[in-house]
Amino acid sequence: MLEWLPEAIRPNITSELLLESLYETVYMVGWSLLFSGVIGILLGVTLVVTRPGHILENSFVFHTLNPIINVLRSVPFIILLVALIPFTRFLMGSAIGTTAAIVPLVFYAGPYIARLIENSLLEVEPGIIEAADAMGASKAQIIFRFILPEALSSLLLSLTTATIGLVGATAMAGAIGAGGIGDVAITYGYQRFDNGTMLITVLLLIVIVQGLQSLGNISSKRVRRR
Amino acid sequence: MLEWLPEAIRPNITSELLLESLYETVYMVGWSLLFSGVIGILLGVTLVVTRPGHILENSFVFHTLNPIINVLRSVPFIILLVALIPFTRFLMGSAIGTTAAIVPLVFYAGPYIARLIENSLLEVEPGIIEAADAMGASKAQIIFRFILPEALSSLLLSLTTATIGLVGATAMAGAIGAGGIGDVAITYGYQRFDNGTMLITVLLLIVIVQGLQSLGNISSKRVRRR
Amino acid sequence: MIEFKQVTKTFHSGNQTVTALDNVNLHVARGEIYGVIGFSGAGKSTLIRSANLLERPTSGEVLINGVNLATLKSRELQKAKRNIGMIFQHFNLLQSKTVFDNVATPLKLTRTPKADIRKRVTELLSFVGLSDKADNYPEQLSGGQKQRIGIARALATNPEVLLCDEATSALDPDTTSSILHLLKKINIEYNITILMITHEMSVIREICDKVAVMEKGRIIEEGSVLSIFSNPQHPTTEKFVRSIIPTGLPARVKEALQQKEPNRRIYEVTVTGDSSHSDLLRSLIQTFGIEVDILHATMNDIQGTSFGRIYFDLRAEPEILAEASNYLKSHPLQPKEVTGDARVAA
Amino acid sequence: MIEFKQVTKTFHSGNQTVTALDNVNLHVARGEIYGVIGFSGAGKSTLIRSANLLERPTSGEVLINGVNLATLKSRELQKAKRNIGMIFQHFNLLQSKTVFDNVATPLKLTRTPKADIRKRVTELLSFVGLSDKADNYPEQLSGGQKQRIGIARALATNPEVLLCDEATSALDPDTTSSILHLLKKINIEYNITILMITHEMSVIREICDKVAVMEKGRIIEEGSVLSIFSNPQHPTTEKFVRSIIPTGLPARVKEALQQKEPNRRIYEVTVTGDSSHSDLLRSLIQTFGIEVDILHATMNDIQGTSFGRIYFDLRAEPEILAEASNYLKSHPLQPKEVTGDARVAA
Amino acid sequence: DSLDETTDYSPDNPVSVKIGVTGTDTPQWDFIADIAAEEGIEIEIVRFNDYVQPNQALADGEIDANAFQTISYFDHFIEEHDLDLTAIGSTVLAPMGLYSTKYDSVDDIPDGAEITIDKEATNQARNLMLLQEAGLLELEDDFGVTSGVDQIKNNPKNIKLTEIVAGNAPRLMEDVDAALINNGIAVDAGLVPPEDAIALESETATPYINIIAARSEDADNPVLQRIVDIYQSDEVKTFIEEEYAGATIPTYISLDELNSYPR
Ligand SMILES: Nc1ncnc2c1ncn2[C@@H]1O[C@H](COP(=O)(O)OP(=O)(O)OP(=O)(O)O)[C@@H](O)[C@H]1O
Ligand SMILES: Nc1ncnc2c1ncn2[C@@H]1O[C@H](COP(=O)(O)OP(=O)(O)OP(=O)(O)O)[C@@H](O)[C@H]1O
Ligand SMILES: [Mg+2]
Ligand SMILES: [Mg+2]
């Protein structure tokens, strides 16, 4: 498949490995985005609505959650990976491989997404929340029917940024045998001084990231109303 | 200094090393935040104001910058580090060490900050820009006297998120001999199975991140006017 | 229905303290349309916002239907609020939803069937004259159109109580009048209670039963619209009344006075209720032989009766005028001679 | 000074096209206060926003001082805009800046010395009555207070042209009147040109020299305020004029008509300018011996003259009334008998 | 976990085995897997990017064997973590070398010179021992396989040691006076170890011979034994020599010999 490339940049890896690693990346990013997105949005919403003066003001929850997120964001990814091994094994049956990597990736991206979401949600006009409150909306309705839709455009951009961050993080998940393009780039390209592999994997990553960003930009723009 | 700790968690490293690595982290994060902050804000502002329909609409600039940022965000940090070696050497005289690490860190964080800033700036009420325009503000004035101050609260949270991201990235900058707490945590704590070192370094990281986040939250809240 | 009991609300900003509500007592009876008027910054919005707890009073309490909302549990509070529609001064529309969905929002909250929602929203949009904007987003609307969406949204659930904060401030007189008529209509048909903030005396005149005047956080005067208009006590109230019943001398009267003709006098008669001028006119014209002209007259139609002033221009020989002046002094309508010095233009 | 030449502006949203301005031609002369009135959604904001290119017209051109802004280079355009103050319908204040800094913003843009800024802003704030709010942030202000900050900001640089989009819509009559007086004053003192959007006819009456009426993106009528008020041509214009000179039957007149007494007739006299009623009164009372009462009267004072209506209540034997009716038919004031069927309440 | 029940296998009734490797060792394992597959052993290669996880995963039963480490690292690791693992065969040796773009011999290295060493613990220990061998440093007596810079007794030339990631050493050579580089990496980076190195680990450095490790209970498992045999076959030896161009030297010694290095 790649034989037609000039020698200097012809990768030393098989196209099967490349395709497989592409699949692994998509698989890891997809699943961990799903979970960390849900968790991150939940945490982000909680961080916003429990803060002083907000609709579900709860000093205890806010002041517990806030540092927990900070702690998770403090730990270097590799150490997080290790610290989570027992939990990963309990959850996934195994602590190695592509599937197992989803757990630490979720722990990595969840709190990160929470922070981005928090920032987006704080920009919602307080008047909107007042209107919701005055209509007798329940707290859940205020969140799901007012705050989230109003912040949607910014949320989509935040999720885009987070997704691209996840793509980057999968490269590190190679430590537990997760594979993925980033890992191939590092182990075959970088460590083996194989410029061809480096080039093609980085190109693939660029295509992925470019695609994700375009998708994010377009969908965010489509729902932006100002 | 650390001899009073119970043996199980007494780190095998000297307190000098710890202090030095703390200094290295602060040094790297400080400088790279300064540069990547400036660059990120410039790029973020450019991404916003050159987009279709905005005050400095410029399809060429926007459609050039956008993918360049994506490219930089695509490359795994370790590969970015390597790819930048010649440039770093040219700029810093050497591609090794704490100072040299600032270059790849800036390349890593700059585009990332740009994306966060972009999202924050897009949330500024268009009416504000109209008011500025109607007053005869120059483009630079519109940006610096209207858009940036109005987005300040969100910008501060974005910069906080980015700074914490930078703290995480410094752990990886150990690859070129940059040192720092994250690196000590990985090489002394994780690789040498020294739980004491792991604990104390991670605790230090937590304190740093917690401090940064609190600072960000407080300053953002102070300037938030809604 | 709505009762404010010694409600005080202070805001702190820096080292400044603003007392937006200062020991306010107010009672709005069921089915009443109660207007609150006052200068900008008087505390009107704060008052109405504390009715549904958007602002928690610093002290005092607000009862709706005899219930202090502040004592309710979350769910009960929501239920209570669903019975209170609110029109916001700054509209507070959802930017992310179409006009249709904005109006439908309160209905969706109560899980109204889709078909019912469609019917009700269509009806409301057609009433506020925005059927063709159903699929537009708020940012594509003019100021008045946004306000009308806010009105439609507040009415969507047929609430028992309606809180209107400057509901017609951005609307032209024609639209205002049709909105006010609608409010009056639902007030009569459904016995809905309306608390209405406004800075326009004409709104009060048009539909309110009672009115309170606020100044600096205090209610300085209140009563039936009729009594306030006919007999304002407080200077501020008078200013508002004057805004639709001018009390300054009309230009034509001033002009006439400037000519200072000896055989001409100008009299002002204040009209209250059903006063009759026929005997006055007859006496002046027939008995005294005076030439009587109506120089200026402004009367307001307030709930079926007329209030206002008439300026009569009397011309005759000075001695006849002097004679008539004695007659006029004892006349029950108490005509006052206008000399130009006594009153200052507003 | 401001000239709109065949300006058309269309908005597209989805498959809908809205023509907000439809071939508008308008000329505002230097030093003029030009009012634009129209129903909500008529295109007023779009018109004023195209004057300083906040909306680029789809076709046609706008000249300010003979210059088409659209042809200017960036720097020249900025300079031109600094001479045009604008008050926005939705205020558009900077949330992140204090009241003081908001008003100071346009001065800072031109690098005005600090001391001058302080002096000018203090002066403006005291004028709009918000000196005590200098250090507050917009979100701590009431609706009317925000609007006043917007006004102060627009005036800060003493612009040559002022564009006001509903500058007083959130203000009470007293504040409105003081703002309007200020505008009139700067208009006279500095010969500043003002284009003023409003939905309140009273604003037009108070300070405008000329007025244009918009409907559905078109200017349907324009002229001096006097001519428009005294002689509105288009039904929409009439509606606006009627908003301050009610043309419907007053309640008291309607009530009188309902009693259908045979020896009572009601006549309506339209007052335009300096019409005199003295001979009418004398004839009716003295010649016919009719009992004449003034049932209702509303006159408006427009630029020194009175316009309005008087309702006379005539009581006498039917045959005398019949006789008088012939006399009245030929009277130059053209009194019209009101029967209750002919007119419908507005 | 155990492979016990799967002693019987044939091409028609294949047995599957998971082998953990790190980074770049896959070519020979792909080659071995092909050979083994014909006999009914399906090798699944699990690639790690880290030196801790493969042993952990082996002990936890997530893989059946691993092949990525030197015997000394392995011994140290199982002692530290109290794991019941055993070395079941030797594989290759990739000697370490000291390279410099500035100096032709170790003696030329000046006072205060900067030398890069691997930040990864076992390799770092090897680096330091090579520097001791070259006479640049003196290490503590109890210097072990994961000892680091803190165990340096004497640094007469005041050499500045900079820890970096191994793969960067060739790339950063010109920024320092000398760099310690793994053979594998050196060859990949286009260096010729015997010619370019100014100091080289002796080829018989037993502690640094790589091994295949398994859980002790599986030490005698015929499947694993067969895999060791395949690895140590001439066919594979030739393959490795060609593939790695001398950077990685197939080194097949007995287990006794393997375990007899000086500790
Ligand atoms: N961005 C837009 N997209 C689509 N339609 C628009 C947009 N802006 C304005 N319109 C439409 O153009 C018409 C004129 O709007 P404009 O704001 O000029 O009205 P207006 O006369 O100022 O009304 P008001 O008195 O209510 O402020 C309205 O029907 C409005 O819905
Ligand atoms: N959040 C706040 N912080 C500080 N002061 C406030 C705040 N909200 C309102 N105020 C002040 O309280 C006073 C009353 O405000 P309110 O909005 O009730 O006035 P209002 O009568 O509705 O005026 P308007 O007619 O201009 O809308 C004002 O002086 C205002 O500046
Ligand atoms: Mg208000
Ligand atoms: Mg408008």
From Swiss-Prot, chains C, D:
Matching InterPro entries: AAA+_ATPase, ABC_transporter-like_ATP-bd, ABC_transporter-like_CS, ACT-like_dom_sf, MetN_ABC, MetN_ABC_transporter-like, NIL_domain, P-loop_NTPase
Top-level enzyme category: translocase
Domain ABC transporter: 2-241
Entry membrane topology: Peripheral membrane protein
UniProt feature coiled coil, ranges: none
Gene3D superfamilies in UniProt: 3.30.70.260, P-loop containing nucleotide triphosphate hydrolases
Subcellular localization: Cell membrane
CDD domains: ABC_MetN_methionine_transporter
PROSITE patterns: ABC_TRANSPORTER_1, ABC_TRANSPORTER_2, METN
Catalytic activity entry: L-methionine(out) + ATP + H2O = L-methionine(in) + ADP + phosphate + H(+); D-methionine(out) + ATP + H2O = D-methionine(in) + ADP + phosphate + H(+)
SUPFAM superfamilies to which the protein is assigned, alphabetical: ACT-like (SSF55021), P-loop containing nucleoside triphosphate hydrolases (SSF52540)
One of the Pfam families matching this protein, by short name: ABC_tran
Molecular function GO labels: ABC-type D-methionine transporter activity; ATP binding; ATP hydrolysis activity
Transport found in the keyword field: yes
EC number: 7.4.2.11
GO CC term, one of those recorded: plasma membrane
Signal peptide: none
Main location: membrane
Residues binding ATP: 38-45
Record key words, sorted: Amino-acid transport, ATP-binding, Cell membrane, Membrane, Nucleotide-binding, Translocase, Transport
Family of the protein in this entry: Belongs to the ABC transporter superfamily. Methionine importer (TC 3.A.1.24) family.
Role noted for this protein: Part of the ABC transporter complex MetNIQ involved in methionine import. Responsible for energy coupling to the transport system.
Assembly and oligomerization: The complex is composed of two ATP-binding proteins (MetN), two transmembrane proteins (MetI) and a solute-binding protein (MetQ).
The protein's name in its UniProt record: Methionine import ATP-binding protein MetN 1
The encoding gene: metN1
